[in-house]
Amino acid sequence: MSVRNRVVLAPMSGVTDMPFRELAWRFGAGLVVTEMVASRELVNDTAESWSRLKAAGFRPHMVQLAGREAHWMAEAAKIAADHGADIIDINMGCPAKKVIGGYSGSALMRDPDHALGLIEATVKAVDIPVTLKMRLGWDENSINAPDIARRAEASGIQLVTIHGRTRMQFYEGRADWDAIRAVREVISVPLIANGDVETAHDAQEILRRSGADAVMIGRGCQGRPWHAGVLAGAAEPRREDIADIAVEHYRMMLDFYGEAVAIRHARKHLGWYLERFAPALAGTEKAGIMTSRDPREVAARLYHALDAGALDGREAA
C-alpha cells in the first residue's frame, strides 16, 4: 500500500463525495477516502450507497464501509472490490447517534470480540488491503484502542487510523495526540493519527507525539478542499483564485448529482467557503446564496461575495 505523501483526507459523511475528493486529490492530498458507505445498504443496492461508492479518476480508490453484521460487511467489501475499490476501510470511529444506534461505528468498540469477528470476515472476503479507523475507546474508562489494534493486526488489518478522542467526547475538548502513541507501541503496520489538525505545525506535532506514520485531516478541510495538499507541502491557492475554486466545486456537484439534489448538498460547502473567506457578508446576501434554486444566480452571487471578501481583506484565516 503506497501513497504519495503523509497527509490523508478523512472520510466525512456528507462531505467527501466524489467532487470533494477530486478537488482534494488535485490539490495534493496523499490519500482520500470515500464517505462512509453502509454495508447493508450497498448489498441491498440503494442509490445513495452507489453514489458514495463511485470512484474518482485516480488511484488508490479507498472505500470506507460501516456495519454491525459480519456477513453484510463481507458482502459489501466484495461488491466494493468488484467495482474498483483498491482499499477497504472499516469504520469503528463514527460517533453519530444514528450510526451508533445501529450498533456500528464507534459502538463496536464496546464489544471488541464482535468487532474482531467482523474484521476477520471482511479481511477474508477480499484480496485487497483492509484497514481500520477507530477512536481511543468508548469513554475514558474504556480506552481499548491499543488492544483492538493489536488483535486487528493479527487478523490481517494492514493499516490503523486513530482519532484521539473517545466516542463520548464526540468532538468536544482537544484530541489527545499523546494517547495515540499507545497504539503505535503495539502494532507494526502503518498508523495514521487524526484529530484537531489545522496547521502544518499541528501535523508535525501530532506525528511527533503519536509516533504515527501519517496524519489525517477532516474538518480543517471544510471550505478548503486544498488544505490537505497544503499541509503536505503544496502551494496555498492565491486568495484571488478562491472564488474560481468554489464555483468550480459547485458546478462539479451539479454535474455529479443533478441540479435538484446538488443544490441541497452544496449548501453546507457554500456556507463553509463564505464563513472562511467572506465573513463580513451581510446576512441577506448569504441567505440569497444559500436559498437560491437557480444555479446561475448561485454562481454569480458566490463570485461576487468571495471576490469582495478578497478585496476588503477581512476574510478569515
From Swiss-Prot:
Domain of life assignment:
Bacteria
Name any cofactors this protein relies on.
FMN
Q: What is its EC number?
A: 1.3.1.-
Kindly indicate whether the keyword Cell membrane belongs to this entry: no
Q: Which CDD domains match?
A: DUS_like_FMN
InterPro entries cross-referenced by the UniProt entry: Aldolase_TIM, DUS-like_FMN-bd, DUS_fam, DusB-like, tRNA-dHydroUridine_Synthase_C, tRNA_hU_synthase_CS
Write out the entry's keywords from A to Z.
Flavoprotein, FMN, NADP, Oxidoreductase, RNA-binding, tRNA processing, tRNA-binding
- Which Pfam families does this chain map to? Dus
Q: Which GO terms describe its molecular function?
A: flavin adenine dinucleotide binding; tRNA binding; tRNA dihydrouridine synthase activity
Instruction: Kindly state which reaction or reactions the protein catalyses.
Output: a 5,6-dihydrouridine in tRNA + NAD(+) = a uridine in tRNA + NADH + H(+); a 5,6-dihydrouridine in tRNA + NADP(+) = a uridine in tRNA + NADPH + H(+)
Q: Does the keyword Nucleotide-binding apply?
A: no
Looking at its record, which EC class is this enzyme? oxidoreductase
Task: Cite the binding residues for FMN.
Answer: P11, M12, S13, Q64, K133, N194, G195, D196, G218, R219
Q: Where is the active site?
A: C94
Q: Which NCBIfam families match?
A: nifR3_yhdG
- Name the job this protein performs: Catalyzes the synthesis of 5,6-dihydrouridine (D), a modified base found in the D-loop of most tRNAs, via the reduction of the C5-C6 double bond in target uridines.
Annotated family: Belongs to the Dus family.
This protein's name: Probable tRNA-dihydrouridine synthase
Give the source species.
Rhizobium leguminosarum bv. phaseoli
User: Lineage in the entry?
Assistant: Bacteria, Pseudomonadati, Pseudomonadota, Alphaproteobacteria, Hyphomicrobiales
